Regions:
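Glycine-rich oxoanion-binding loops at beta->alpha junctions
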Residues: 1, 50-55, 115-122, 186-187
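Short glycine-rich anion-binding loops that position phosphate/pyrophosphate groups of nucleotides
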Residues: 9-12, 86-89, 118, 134-137, ...
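Buried hydrophobic packing segments
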Residues: 13, 17, 63-66, 100, ...
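Short secondary-structure boundary/hinge segments and terminal tails
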Residues: 13-14, 121-123
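Glycine-rich phosphate/nucleotide-binding loop
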Residues: 18-31, 37-45, 125-129, 133-238
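Glycine-rich phosphate/diphosphate-binding loop of Rossmann-like nucleotide-binding domains
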Residues: 52-118, 127-128, 132, 144
Length: 238
């Protein structure tokens, strides 16, 4: 097989992927990297659940992997990279963020724009959102929860009166597309980047649409020869 898609245990997929498929030479920790919606398109959240004890060198590689993926799979030229922080200033953040920041500034091959606060992520201020897995997973789950709540609230609000029902009919096409962008199943799963093969982790509660889109991800990944480009472009030492 050229690819593996699973909605099973994240831990089992991580261990199996590294032991059976193996890491690309020089990759320290393969991260999970799902696409998330933004005001003008999508961003890549990396890492969202694979490495809760990440080191600065890991986050630098996440930035490189994310840039390669966004440019070659999503088609974003010279993608902007930001690191999740509690403020925009360079001196803010925990020890991990403070140690990683100067490394990202010095890293060639990426377009680092600095710290990004969580509230700015949906605004599309960057194309690659770098974090360790704990923070990334919290962001991802909040996205999923807010998206599901928003869709539910809008649908129920449209049925409250005859006027709202008529209004809903008038804006239905545009509204449908907008709400679709908040549906996590539209983006497929999260590729485990940095492996010698292609492994995609879908949500444990995935429906048929998400599995289908995860398979489409695999096709795009394979067609664009992402692993070959990672091997060619990854900078192993900072």
């Amino acid at each position: 097989a050229d690819a593996f898609v699973s909605a099973g245990s994240t831990g089992a997929i991580l261990v199996g992927g590294q032991l059976i498929v193996g890491r690309i030479k020089g990759i320290e920790r393969p991260p999970l990297a799902p696409l998330i919606p933004t005001k003008d398109g999508v961003a890549l959240l990396i890492d969202c659940g694979a490495n809760v004890d990440a080191r600065p060198s890991h986050l630098v590689q996440f930035a490189q992997l994310g840039s390669i993926y966004m440019e070659n799979v999503v088609g974003v030229k010279n993608p902007r990279v930001g690191i999740v922080n509690i403020g925009a200033e360079e001196e803010k953040g925990n020890a991990l963020v403070k140690e990683t920041f100067p490394l990202l500034k010095e890293c060639t091959g990426i377009r680092f724009i600095g710290s990004v606060e969580a509230r700015d992520i949906p605004q599309g201020v960057c194309d690659v959102v770098v974090s360790e897995a704990f923070v990334g997973n919290v962001i991802l789950k909040l996205y999923e929860g807010v998206g599901a709540t928003l869709i539910s609230k809008v649908k129920s609000g449209m049925m409250t009166s005859l006027r709202s029902k008529i209004g809903a009919l008038l804006v239905k096409p545009a509204l449908k597309e907008t709400l679709k962008s908040f549906d996590a199943s539209q983006y497929g799963g999260a590729p485990l980047l940095g492996l010698n093969g292609l492994v995609v982790k879908s949500h444990g509660s995935s429906n048929a649409v998400e599995i289908k889109n995860s398979i489409i991800q695999c096709v795009q990944f394979k067609q664009q020869k992402i692993n070959e480009k990672i091997k060619e472009n990854i900078i192993l030492k900072q």
